[in-house]
Amino acid sequence: MVLSHLRFLILLITLLPRASLSENLSHPNAAAAGPDLRNRPFVVVWNMPTANCQKRHNVHLDLQDFGIVENQRQRFQGQNMTIFYRNRLGNYPYISHDGREVNGGIPQLGDLASHLSLVEVQLDVLLRPGFSGVGVIDWEEWLPLWENNFGSKMEYRRLSKQLVRQERLDLSEQDVKLLAQQEFEESARMFMEETLRLVVRRRPRGFWGFYGFPSCYNKNKRKRGRCHSGTKQKNDRLSWLWAQSTALYPSIYLPQRLAGSTDAALMIRHRLLEALRVASTWRHGNSNNQAIPVLPYARLAFTHTLNFLNETDLEHTIGESVSLGAAGVVLWGEMKFAKSKKQCVLLRDYIHTVLGPFIQTLRAGASRCSLQLCYSHGRCARRRPNSGRSLSSAPVSVSHKDTDSGSSKYFQQHFRCRCYSGWTGTWCQRKMVGRGQDKS
């Protein structure tokens, strides 16, 4: 096993770009100063492969000017933000688009021990021991609940039933389906749960979770944004996943058809509320102290397009997130945002004129509310989720004093506090001592 790890490490080092290794391995024992999600009202993290804008097209995006957290040289993977796709972490079993059964194809036929061994080696190569950034696992080929694998994912059900038939010729078709479901869900759970357990154990300061979880299943236009019936029950069945997660990363991407529509805010709101419910119900390590942070994945353009969101659409996505009490957002995008100098210039201008100022205003409102309402020991969240009240709408005095009575009254009337770890009380005014006790 040691020899195989060594061989893989040598191979990986030869394949990785030299600059990437320089960042990751030059100071292997150094603690990375990732985004401080535990003690900041709202964090915006950049997860877009835009390094080529500077490297190839000499277009600088100036993300730090607007307080956006990025990796060194805007790399897609780094010490502040890293995302692992299906072929970048271990031996994830899946069926390729051309029908190949990769690493066994279905979870039941995957080699979990080999997978976990490889994950451990990859973590040691790519992330410093002190990694404290956003860590996302993006596995979308199959879903851990049997009934959610429909459409193109039905192949996982078919192969699971085929496997049972080969091993149990005596079973009826109904029993085949039941056993196939049981075996699939147990194996899917093992791959996801043990992978998460391992990365949290090896890099405990990171914020680890699976992209797209929890889901709300609310794409149906007739439901006015409400989650699909049975959503809570489905997500409750994934309690094992939430118990191992140290952050949640639901998706709040916006389709073009909802541009400028209040239905967009409703759809995003219900997704966030379900994620916040899950975060407050299952807390990592069974801690009774603090809900795990929720950082929804957002796009600065409509889904499958390069059409940027305007301020109204940003309010319906990022604005909803901060006003409902999310710890932050992760901004994601594809390579095509940096495909040419023209596109990089468009992106830079959008950041400078729309996105950046919008984020600055939101973060300022979140910080003011945290200071005035929560003694800077918590983040603010709407008292009534459907009120539509925004943290950025609080009145600001001419003198810009933090003690402005107008904004304090607004915050007290429309928001409440979600305390950071170690603090308690209605306004997060009491420091906790020991486990679950507070110091009055």
Place the predicted regions along the sequence by residue.
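N-terminal signal peptide
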Residues: 2-40
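Alpha-helical scaffolding within the catalytic cores
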Residues: 67-69, 119-122, 226-239, 270-281, ...
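Aromatic- and acid-rich polysaccharide-binding/catalytic face
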Residues: 79-94, 141, 146-149, 153-179, ...
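Non-catalytic scaffold segments within catalytic domains of secreted glycoside hydrolases
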Residues: 210-239, 255-261, 266, 303-326
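Glycoside hydrolase catalytic-domain groove-lining segments
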Residues: 237, 243, 252-301
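Disulfide-braced loops of extracellular cysteine-rich modules
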Residues: 367-377
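Extracellular cysteine-rich, disulfide-stabilized repeat modules
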Residues: 380, 409, 413-422
